[in-house]
Amino acid sequence: MPPPHLHGTIAATLTKRTMSESTPATPQQYVQQKAASSGSSFYYAFLFLPAQKRAAITAFYAFCREVDDVVDEVMDPGVAQTKLAWWQNEVRQAFAGKPSHPVLQALMPHAPAFGIEQRHLMAVIEGCQMDLQQTRYLDFAGLQRYCHLVAGVVGEVSARIFGQTQPQTTDYAHQLGLALQLTNIIRDVGEDAMRGRIYLPISDLQHFGVKASAILAREYSPEFVELMRYQAQRAHQYYDKALALLPAADRRAQKPGLMMASIYRTLLREIEQENFQVLHQRISLTPLRKFWLAWKVQALGAHRI
């Protein structure tokens, strides 16, 4: 852990980001820049939303990016833990009416209207803390817990913002969040291995006869391909579960989530067609293709996801 005097320094640095010359003038501009610069597929799903919903989901997404970046960009685990602790305190302050970081200044005005609660934001931070505390998951149940925090809860909040009238839509959102996260894990196996991380359950590696050392060394084998095919089949099952759970009454409002399903499931199929060559490259869709997939859901519905 960093020495005590760094706690104040880190907090001051995080807060001062709102004052730096490179930071946009308003919280709304800050979160818009954060969302657009990430290059994420989520950005394309936001484009078709009405202004208030787009502002709310953009602010929430920017919050998720901020805390996730702590794990991805801070090399010292002790400093990263301190930053996440700062974020926990910042969330508490924000729900007490005193946000200081621009992402929460942008998000909090929307929280009452869309039912965004303190527990939602804390869960996202808890998921990032899990990333710092472990680099392996023994079984799928353990991985599910992680996915619940970093993706299921995100799906739940997103569904509330998009427009939810049926309780079952929460179940849909959690299943879809899990499907999206499993797709991310499949896509990023090689990148994660470079950072010493393996999200694929160890029990699955053992079942297919794949050594963790082979993944960390980014070595392909027929066993690895079979392991990844199994992971893809599991992800497809969760896409199917999610789509089956979405009530007809909420289907129109939940189009942004269905856009994400279309984009990510198309990516998953691309990875399958590439025979899971994910250890040495990051397979992705072009921005134009992502926009086209999002537009098709907006214009034609989600019958072929």
Tell what function each PLM region has.
Residues 10, 14-182, 186, 190-305:
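Catalytic cores of Mg2+-dependent Asp-rich isoprenoid enzymes
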